Amino acid sequence: MDGGTLPRSAPPAPPVPVGCAARRRPASPELLRCSRRRRPATAETGGGAAAVARRNERERNRVKLVNLGFQALRQHVPHGGASKKLSKVETLRSAVEYIRALQRLLAEHDAVRNALAGGLRPQAVRPSAPRGPPGTTPVAASPSRASSSPGRGGSSEPGSPRSAYSSDDSGCEGALSPAERELLDFSSWLGGY
């Protein structure tokens, strides 16, 4: 050996990723696990960003459709304060109350129809006070508009039943179908909304 030369050392080993064991074999399972962990992070910058953008676009479209649905529902439910936009929760509550009021009206109408069909005199069928959306006052409901005065659908005898479709309020009702007359009676029932 030369006195001034140092023995040559082995070439430096490739750097080992942080967090991996100090094994230097490239085929070691530990090194493979570390390299697999790094790959998805680099893949997200390319294909992952597009997937995130598509997901965000789908969510924006979903929210847009939900908002359009609420906008359409607001147009169909009655609300007292027309000057302010109902919140989503208020819209849903108003829709529930509106549906319940319609169900009560249909139940009352069916009871009157059944009583008239059976030849029985309808008993004073009065629905419970209709509850409208918050802030509105209930309106008295009576789709049959029973009265003792003679009219197109009634008789001159006091207390005799009248047709649920008759009304003395309008002179053009004779040209309307029964469904249209029922809607007119219903709209007068909702007059306060």
From Swiss-Prot:
Gene3D superfamilies reported for this sequence: Helix-loop-helix DNA-binding domain
Gene Ontology molecular function terms on file: bHLH transcription factor binding; DNA-binding transcription activator activity, RNA polymerase II-specific; DNA-binding transcription factor activity, RNA polymerase II-specific; DNA-binding transcription repressor activity, RNA polymerase II-specific; E-box binding; protein dimerization activity; RNA polymerase II cis-regulatory region sequence-specific DNA binding; RNA polymerase II transcription regulatory region sequence-specific DNA binding
Pfam families assigned to the protein according to its UniProt record, in alphabetical order: HLH (PF00010)
Domain bHLH positions: 50-102
Biological-process GO terms, alphabetical: chorionic trophoblast cell development; negative regulation of Schwann cell proliferation; negative regulation of T-helper 1 cell differentiation; negative regulation of T-helper 17 cell differentiation; negative regulation of T-helper 2 cell differentiation; negative regulation of transcription by RNA polymerase II; neuron differentiation; placenta development
Extra remark: In contrast to the mouse ortholog, the ASCL2 locus is not imprinted in human placenta.
Protein name: Achaete-scute homolog 2
Species, as recorded: Homo sapiens
